[in-house]
Swiss-Prot record:
Its main location: secreted. Signal peptide: none annotated. It is found in: Secreted. This is Serine protease inhibitor Kazal-type 1. The lineage of its organism: Eukaryota, Metazoa, Chordata, Craniata, Vertebrata. The record marks R18, I19 as: Reactive bond for trypsin. Residues 3-56 form the Kazal-like domain. The gene is SPINK1. Keywords: Disulfide bond, Protease inhibitor, Secreted, Serine protease inhibitor. SMART domains: KAZAL. One of its GO terms (cellular component) is extracellular region. The record marks Y20, N21 as: Necessary for sperm binding. Serine protease inhibitor which exhibits anti-trypsin activity. In the pancreas, protects against trypsin-catalyzed premature activation of zymogens. In the male reproductive tract, binds to sperm heads where it modulates sperm capacitance by inhibiting calcium uptake and nitrogen oxide (NO) production. It comes from the Eukaryota. Disulfide bonds join C9-C38, C16-C35, C24-C56.
Length: 56
């Protein structure tokens, strides 16, 4: 039973694209897009996965 999938990071030097394509993290937080969730994981050293596409 898979809880979620790993967020894929792009190697964007300027940060994430400003595209609103929300994903729901396994931490119960809605992220504006997959890239932003991935960046948060990198900054906080957390293993949050994508629970589902769309807001939580």
């Amino acid at each position: 039973n898979i809880l979620g999938r790993e967020a894929k990071c792009t190697n964007e030097v300027n940060g994430c694209p400003r595209i609103y394509n929300p994903v729901c993290g396994t931490d119960g937080v809605t992220y504006a897009n997959e890239c932003l969730l991935c960046m948060e994981n990198k900054e906080r050293q957390t293993p949050v996965l994508i629970q589902k596409s769309g807001p939580c």
